[in-house]
Regions:
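N-terminal start-of-chain detector that recognizes signal peptides
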Residues: 2-3, 38-42, 104-105, 151-152
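N-terminal phosphate-binding loop and adjacent alpha-helix
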Residues: 27-57
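Solvent-exposed, well-ordered amphipathic alpha-helical segments
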Residues: 18-21, 55, 113, 154
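Active-site neighborhood for divalent-cation/phosphate handling
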Residues: 70-158
Length: 158
């Protein structure tokens, strides 16, 4: 059985949902103390880690694997259409679709995608791919990973 706790950290509250497999076991919504989050950014990762640890324990939510909703301000997202290509070609080309938005070198980002649809030609062969693509700084991911680790969780999903 896979156990995971989902976190949604907002401006004023933290929402937690604990799942065992596909079954929702427990939820909690706790108000954040003042000055924890501003403009979608956590002001002190250490203070947030301590809050999450105490909030989970107080709500009967175990310290286990974690999934985190990342604020829109921390991730670049795009809907893109590309010619049909292999996964290897896609991972090579994906960073170039964000070149006008990234503030750092492409090597400092994680890139991912989900296929929204495949457009086939008249013979039924893939012609184009419509993707939901995203990019996030590796340092941002590491900051969240370290925060959750300090709180007693293991980041598995962003």
């Amino acid at each position: 059985m896979n156990k995971i706790v989902g976190f949604d950290i907002g401006e004023n509250s933290v929402k937690m949902a604990y799942f065992v497999g596909r079954e929702l076991k427990r939820t909690a919504k706790l108000e954040l103390p003042d000055a924890m989050v501003s403009g979608g950014r956590i002001l002190s990762m250490d203070a947030m880690a301590d809050f999450l640890h105490d909030a989970a324990k107080g709500s009967g939510i175990p310290l286990t694997n974690a999934a985190l909703v990342v604020p829109a301000s921390e991730v670049y997202t795009r809907i893109i259409t590309l010619p049909a290509m292999t996964e290897q070609q896609l991972f090579y080309n994906l960073p170039y679709e964000f070149r006008d938005f990234l503030t750092e070198e492409k090597s400092k980002y994680f890139f991912d995608y989900a296929v929204r649809r495949i457009v086939n030609d008249e013979t039924g062969h893939p012609k184009e791919m419509e993707l939901f693509a995203c990019a996030i700084l590796k340092t941002t991911v590491e900051g969240y990973r370290a925060m959750l680790h300090r709180a007693g969780f293991r980041l598995r999903v962003l």
